[in-house]
Amino acid sequence: MCVKHIKKAIKDGEIPKGALREIRITPTRECLDTSDNQALSLMKTSFIERSCLMNSCRTASTLNIPCCEGVAFIIPEGGATVEGGWIRHCWNKKNGYYFDVTREYAMSVPVKEMYYFMIEEHKSIEYEQQLQSTGGIEFISKAVKFSDILNNYDG
């Protein structure tokens, strides 16, 4: 279902071809070495639901790794709802593996499946500079625009 939305949005010219790349998320403990897992275990209770960008930026800054911006399609466990299914989302990458601290440590909605489509990677310094100049952080990529577009397709 989610790939149908993307194909239609590309066909309609709403999203450029090649702008989204499906990626696979690996459990955090499988992506990180012992010292990184220890650093993350000290942080994980402070991760906040619906704050994926902040959670990913803090992880990136602590572990010196990139933030990955994109969109995700959520299929909740029986009966729970997620507005539209598509969300703008941010996760991390280390040694070629993608992992999502927000899903693992902060989401309260039980998720049956979650599909990830990456737009761009950014260094944590880019967000730190944004924070210093504007007082906040926002998605740098077109993740917000693309999630809005995809939520308007019926598939």
Task: State where each predicted segment sits.
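A structural boundary/capping signal
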Residues: 1-155
